């Protein structure tokens, strides 16, 4: 009699003689980190090096997507984010108190960054 495996479980895992078989992870993005900025904004320019470092440090993680919305394309950019990542949510992305506005969307939940726009603080906030 042949033994069958239950592949319906999301976390299906089977160990046999030092081999592990695991379902492939989905390509769905769990975390979106973004900023709305203006080229002429002094605060945006001051934050740019830390933002680039954040992207470099966290960009290696496959489940994180970075979004940058420039002031010239603000309405279109926010519409794309709202449609793609917040489609089922009542809350929609908007500019919060000026430039830069830094935000994250984790599993459809939107939150804004209100701390110091330095690498260490932004990194802590990303994983809260």
Model-derived features: positions:
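Thioredoxin-like thiol-disulfide oxidoreductase module
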Residues: 60-127
């Amino acid at each position: 009699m042949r033994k069958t495996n239950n592949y319906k479980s999301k976390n299906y895992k089977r160990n046999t003689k030092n081999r592990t078989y695991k379902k492939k992870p989905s390509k769905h993005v769990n975390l979106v980190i973004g900023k709305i900025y203006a080229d002429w904004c002094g605060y945006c320019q001051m934050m740019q090096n830390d933002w680039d470092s954040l992207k470099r440090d966290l960009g290696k993680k496959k489940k994180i997507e970075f979004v940058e919305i420039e002031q010239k394309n603000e309405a279109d950019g926010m519409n794309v984010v709202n449609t793609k990542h917040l489609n089922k949510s009542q809350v929609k992305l908007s500019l919060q108190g000026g430039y830069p506005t830094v935000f994250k969307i984790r599993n459809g939940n939107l939150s804004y960054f209100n701390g110091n726009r330095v690498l260490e603080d932004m990194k802590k906030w990303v994983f809260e």
